[in-house]
Regions:
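Gly/Pro/Ser/Thr-rich low-complexity, intrinsically disordered segments predominantly at protein N-termini
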Residues: 1-175
Length: 175
């Protein structure tokens, strides 16, 4: 991820970076380019999208969260519950945010993002590593990521995501 030096307003950010790929995120007033996704990243993103739908969430990929004037992230996968509010971007915290690591991602920046999602009130924050075949969830009590061992029980809905299922699907897609 590359950070651009000058601070910008939300309006300036959207005017300059809205159509750029790889995507940019606004982080504390600074445009930060997301890492270029690999094939494995893209496959895992699609699998997580599908699994969230199967678990009863309305899932979306690369959805910009327009909740703050200074921080506008674009998580890899989001999950929502309930009726659509008709807005182009969520303006309130979504129940599920998933980040998929790319080789260039700095883990400290990922932790910072997770901490911000938690401050917003997002109950289910997950991070997946498609290469290391690991996943973490955000733990409010420790204010840190905790490794998912076998499955993750969502807080926003009484369902569970099985980690073996995730990576078995990734293996099947990758073969």
């Amino acid at each position: 991820m590359n950070a651009v030096a000058d601070k910008v307003t939300l309006e300036q950010f959207r005017a300059k970076y809205a159509e750029c790929k790889p995507y940019y995120e606004l982080q504390d007033g600074e445009p930060v380019q997301k890492a270029l996704p690999t094939k494995r990243h893209a496959l895992l993103q699609g699998i997580l999208y599908t699994l969230l739908r199967e678990l009863g969430f309305q899932s979306m990929t690369e959805l910009t969260l327009a909740i703050s004037e200074t921080w506008e992230p674009t998580p890899d996968v989001c999950g929502q519950l309930g009726p659509d509010d008709g807005q182009p971007y969520p303006t309130k915290p979504v129940p599920v945010v998933i980040e998929v690591l790319s080789p260039e991602d700095r883990f400290t920046r990922v932790i910072q993002k997770c901490r911000r999602y938690a401050r917003w009130g997002t109950p289910d924050i997950l991070v997946f590593d498609p290469v290391g075949r690991e996943a973490w969830h955000w733990d409010i009590a420790t204010d840190d990521l905790v490794r998912v061992k076998q499955g993750y029980a969502f807080k926003s809905k009484l369902v569970e995501l099985n980690l073996d299922d995730v990576f078995e699907r990734l293996d099947a897609e990758n073969s």
